[in-house]
Amino acid sequence: MKTLAWVLLLLCTAATPLRAAELELDSSLNETVLMIPKQGLFTIKLETTLYKPEGAGPFPVVIINHGKAYGDPRFQDRYRPLSGVRYFLQRGYAVVVPMRQGFSKSEGSYIGGGCNIESNGEVQAGDVKAVLDYVTAQPWADREQMLMVGQSHGGWTTLAFGTLNYPGVKALVNFAGGLRQDQCTAWERGLAIAAGSYAKATRVPSLWFYGDNDSFFNTSTYQGMHAAYTGAGGQARLVAFGKFGSDSHSLFGARAGEKIWQGELTTFLKSVGLPGEAQSALAKYGKVSGMAVPEKTEFAALKDDSRIPFVRDTGRAGYKLYLNKPIPRAFAIAPNGAWGYADGDPDPLKRSLDACNRNGKAQCKLYSVDDFVVWKED
């Protein structure tokens, strides 16, 4: 019966809701998931998360594009950038988060383009356009008030999308955009050349966020991209915010990063004629439930797993896996050697403690949260 249902889903050409029970949807943010068709030689469905304020709209629309994790894109989780979602919902936006072809439950295969980074971005932007074509046909969408945002590979996709000059898209926001390709000769120079090429065809302004301890793109890499983009006529304001935590690449997903990007983004939105100020009537969307984040301690460096108390080799190996998970995240330990971690919303702190306490005899405590250690010795 399940096989038949899946076949029917593939045959359907309309955007199809997925069952909430399968996805742990956040009802407080009106979260839903659709499979949106992308028409071509073959129709493929793109897994897309939608968050909307209550009411009929029309709402301004923001697309948030995801990055690319290490490994097979099919095993990448559905992207849920809830910090950004809350920011935009409070300002009355409908938030659309598409998973591109070959990622998570989206159909098709990831098309990398080899070392042709310019082509890579253009292919990714094609998937985003298919989703936006669907969105702009909905009565709740304000087709004249739209914004494109992206993080990491999604930031690169956002810059590539700018070349389409899609009607109603007023601006682009790029958080640490690019794609690191160590296997390609002079890949940093390739990024800069492609950025300049995108700029020549882009008519809308953009806002860029990059830090100086980014594990993917060093300072000279992002400065070269920005120089090439603006040198080719692109409108791009660079917010170079210096160092952030142990890896500035995580700024957009980290709670501590909000104070860096939110004020800058609010000013930028107002400058391009988009809603920038939070509305008091929508304040409920800004409330974050769950455990409070403990204060950072100086017990140990974040990446020094040798200092973690109690755990054995398996726990230290688990901690290494934890450090590769996206923020928000948390890692918990217990005196008997039990450990557990969780990443993503909702409330990774509580979920990491729950995972640890399956064997921790209710004695688990948090060792690390997000990008820092919170452990205190008794």
Describe the role of every protein-language-model region.
Residues 140-151:
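Alpha/beta-hydrolase fold nucleophile elbow
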Residues 116-139:
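Alpha/beta-hydrolase active-site loop
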Residues 21-56:
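N-terminal cap/lid segment of alpha/beta-hydrolase-fold proteins
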Residues 58-67:
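Short beta-strand element of the alpha/beta-hydrolase
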Residues 171, 177-237:
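The feature captures the conserved acid-bearing segment of alpha/beta-hydrolase catalytic domains
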Residues 69-81, 87, 97-123:
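Cap/lid segment of the alpha/beta-hydrolase catalytic domain
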Residues 103, 279-378:
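Secreted/extracellular ectodomain signature
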Residues 232-290:
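C-terminal catalytic histidine-bearing segment of alpha/beta-hydrolase fold enzymes
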